[in-house]
Amino acid sequence: MQIGSAIGQDKVIMKQVMESASLPVVDYTWFFDNEYLEDKDTILKNIKNVGYPVVVKPATLGSSVGITLVKSEKDIESAIEEAISYDNKIVVEQAIDNLIEVNSSVLGNYEFQRVTPLEEVMGLDEILSYSDKYLGGSKGSKSASKGMASYRYAHLLIVDAIVFRQ
């Protein structure tokens, strides 16, 4: 795996790289599953300091697999358990109001690359699932994206970016 791809695939390392370049990063905390099992109270306190609502994510997966939007403290533990079922490294970040989600897939290597057109997801108030993004399950919104179902080739890297509305 190329170093750029490896860095980009780990959400915690990517945030640290962005911070070191003085780029804005939402407030977040991260932990390993064993740390959560050994000291749940400290982890929950750190999450509370980030401030609700938060997004709980497996740190090294893409395509919205295992991601949960948590609006209040009462739902945080089930969201963490969901994320832990996919990865042993978890990132919890502040949710952003009025965000724009932009999706693109990249297939290839150093000799050949194919990039799908950028896709801005419209008309949704919630985070998209894997099905929403790739199988056309757009949560019932007619203005939402049809997903990337037309790009049925195997993708090696998914690039998900969030652009902030000013």
Q: Which residues are covered by each model-predicted region?
A:
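Short, contiguous strand/loop micro-motifs
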Residues: 1-2, 66, 163
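Short, acidic/turn-prone active-site loops that include or flank metal/cofactor-
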Residues: 2-5, 122
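Phosphate-binding site of ATP-dependent enzymes
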Residues: 71-154, 158, 162-165
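Active-site nucleotide/adenylate-binding loops and adjacent lid/helix of ATP-dependent enzymes
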Residues: 5-100, 110
